Design a protein with these regions (language model features):
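Donor nucleotide-sugar binding loop of glycosyltransferases
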Residues: 19-22, 44, 98
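Cell-envelope/extracellular polymer assembly enzymes that use nucleotide-activated donors
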Residues: 9-11, 179
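Short beta-strand/loop segment that forms part of the nucleotide-sugar
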Residues: 27, 35-44, 61-63, 91
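A conserved acidic beta->alpha catalytic loop
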Residues: 41-50, 95
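Short beta-strand-to-loop acidic/aromatic patch adjacent to the donor-nucleotide binding site
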Residues: 85-96
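Acceptor/aglycone-binding surface of glycosyltransferases and processive sugar-polymer synthases
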Residues: 65-67, 71-82, 99-174, 200-219
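Catalytic donor-sugar/metal-binding loop of nucleotide-sugar-dependent glycosyltransferases
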Residues: 148, 169-172, 182-199
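Short, well-formed alpha-helical segments that are part of the catalytic scaffolds
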Residues: 16-32
Length: 222
């Protein structure tokens, strides 16, 4: 069945950890483009619950402790399958990913099984070390997958929900987004890219460089 022949049911998975300032903004900006929001709380210790409203369109999943982004993505994807969505969107809770581009990602699912936001043509504001690590990881992953991967680390993605059971990540950290692509290529699923702007703020990144690199290399070479 071609999911684009009817109006698809869209679920947006938003993993978050201590994002009480930005989470409600992201949810409100995403609601016009998704039927369901699956907000995955990764052990937050702030007062985020005071800032969001849970209703029939906003589902909250919570972990008791901080498990990692990959763990949260896994839980969110499973919930999306459970709720019988046709399309699963993933995006970050820190306002880096503009939800108004969700329709463009969905449109490209006519041609691909996975569509990833490509930020690397829009580098304004991206810290230099992030540009370097992203380009290097994208080159290495392109070699591994025998396909040009423009932006391997972007978490702003659209998936056909029907393929999620084949590509769920086991990695708990940031490397999970790379693992998903490795799993997808092993199953011969197609991967496309849509150019998006990315908004970078001055706040300190939570990505621990050494741990992330080690996880990325483990995914790449196993």
């Amino acid at each position: 069945l071609n999911i684009m022949q009817k109006k698809p049911k869209v679920a947006a998975v938003i993993p978050f950890f201590n994002e009480q300032e930005t989470l409600p903004v992201v949810i409100n900006q995403t609601l016009p483009f998704a039927d369901l929001i699956i907000a995955v709380n990764d052990g937050s210790t702030d007062d985020f619950l005071k800032h969001i409203r849970i209703n029939e369109r906003i589902v909250l999943i919570s972990s008791k402790k901080n498990e990692g982004k990959g763990f949260s993505i896994n839980r969110g994807m499973k919930k999306s399958m459970e709720l019988n969505s046709d399309i699963t969107i993933t995006l970050d809770a820190d306002l880096q990913h503009p939800p108004e581009y969700i329709p463009q990602l969905i449109e490209m699912l006519k041609y691909y099984d996975i569509v990833i936001g490509n930020r690397l043509r829009n580098l304004r504001g991206m810290p230099f070390q992030r540009i370097l690590s992203n380009k290097l990881s994208s080159v290495l992953l392109s070699i591994k997958l025998k396909q040009v991967i423009s932006d391997s680390q972007c978490g702003f993605r659209a998936y056909k929900t029907s393929i999620l059971h084949d590509i769920l990540p086991l990695s708990k950290g940031y490397e999970a987004e790379t693992e998903i692509l490795v799993n997808a290529k092993r199953k011969n699923y197609s991967i496309g890219f849509a150019e998006i702007p990315t908004i970078y703020t001055n706040r300190k990144s939570r990505m621990r460089s050494f741990k992330t690199i080690r996880g990325f290399l483990r995914v790449l070479f196993t």
